[in-house]
Amino acid sequence: MKERSTELVQGFRHSVPYINAHRGKTFVVMLGGEAIEHENFSSIVNDIGLLHSLGIRLVVVYGARPQIDSNLAQHHYEPVYHKHTRVTDARTLEMVKQAAGLLQLDITARLSMSLNNTPLQGAHINVVSGNFIIAQPLGVDDGVDYCHSGRIRRIDEEAIHRQLDNGAIVLLGPVAVSVTGESFNLTSEEVATQLAIKLKAEKMIGFCSSQGVTDSEGNIISELFPNDAQKRIEDLEQEGDYNSGTVRFLRGAVKACRSGVRRSHLLSYQEDGALVQELFSRDGIGTQIVMESAEQVRRATINDIGGILELIRPLEQQGILVRRSREQLEMEIDKFTIIERDNLTIACAALYPFPEEQIGEMACVAVHPDYRSSSRGEMLLKRVANQARQMGLKKLFVLTTRSIHWFQERGFTPAEVDVLPIQKQELYNYQRRSKILLADL
């Protein structure tokens, strides 16, 4: 019981910075028809209600692709696509309206009761839908008339902001009207993407059947830049995947990211609590598309001393690193390089140059326990080696008691004390007996 309580406390402590950071921000959440059909959908809705209770401004966009196809199949009506876009004739439009209307009522009801059976039971969630989007027809392409398939002409973002200011969740579907009063079938990814851009949303969030984008070995890729995401889209399309939740969301995420939306997140609709884990933990659980990485490798400043001390103290207590006082760190802070993730220092290293001997020491190498199985140490080594080359240094050495093989695997070879700069030879601790490893730059 005590262990569970400790986990709860630690989890809450780690989530508090994200609660504060997200409060008052606008998120656009895209719910594809596949996510709505899944048995975990009620949990997703409950988590959306939780986000609303934490002061996050929410616009929820829902799709209805499988529900529309099901309606068509029941009426023995074959869906028609041109260039992977549905052709919406008059009969299809009626089924689109029917599916979208039922989903709007269902999602509104679920959101309205999403805080039941929680400590916030009794809190009222106001869900608002309306004609915030004006549509226009796609027209004719290669002789094919898309009929009532449309695209966005304009968005009344001021009206949406007023609803968000009043504490409502704005719920929008795939049907919008034109200035002439006609109805058009839109794609949920276009609606979500354009809303995120026009509302200057902090995040756009989507769901797919997997936990995100995976590499060739099936591992989740936690972060993609737009160009990488575009390459992934092209790879999937070459495999014949044009309309999966992953591809549809990635297309929108690339556009949103390049248009100022800071982060777009792709999560699994099958994973219970994926939305909460992604937004309120440092490493998340899915894939995010970003213009700027959540992680930065940079030179340390005086403001980083607390984070560096917190990182290296456990290693000093274990005897792995030589102890450094706060005063010493303050004097030597310009020699340190850190890796920072969401304002947490997760790795550090220092470069001490000896210009006369054209050699440098890489020291105080530390990586947060949660990230030691990743490539952060290698990132620091490359950065420090580049700094040494820019200083005109020819060699780099390290003194280590534990990481001998790690450095040897990266080009360092064992050496004797006499290869060290004279100043360093005089300070060498023969009782500690650190191994000396040397690499050419």
UniProtKB/Swiss-Prot annotation:
Write down the EC number. 2.3.1.1
Q: Where in the cell is it found?
A: Cytoplasm
A GO cellular component entry from the record: cytoplasm
Q: Which residues form a coiled coil?
A: none
Q: Which reaction does it catalyse?
A: L-glutamate + acetyl-CoA = N-acetyl-L-glutamate + CoA + H(+)
Pathway participation = Amino-acid biosynthesis; L-arginine biosynthesis; N(2)-acetyl-L-ornithine from L-glutamate: step 1/4
Key word Transferase present: yes
Its domain of life?
Bacteria
**Chain ranges of the N-acetyltransferase domain:** 295-434
UniProt enzyme class: transferase
Against PANTHER family, the record matches this protein to: AMINO-ACID ACETYLTRANSFERASE (PTHR30602), AMINO-ACID ACETYLTRANSFERASE NAGS1, CHLOROPLASTIC-RELATED (PTHR30602:SF12)
Query: Its family?
Result: Belongs to the acetyltransferase family. ArgA subfamily.
Protein name, UniProt field? Amino-acid acetyltransferase
Origin species: Yersinia enterocolitica serotype O:8 / biotype 1B (strain NCTC 13174 / 8081)
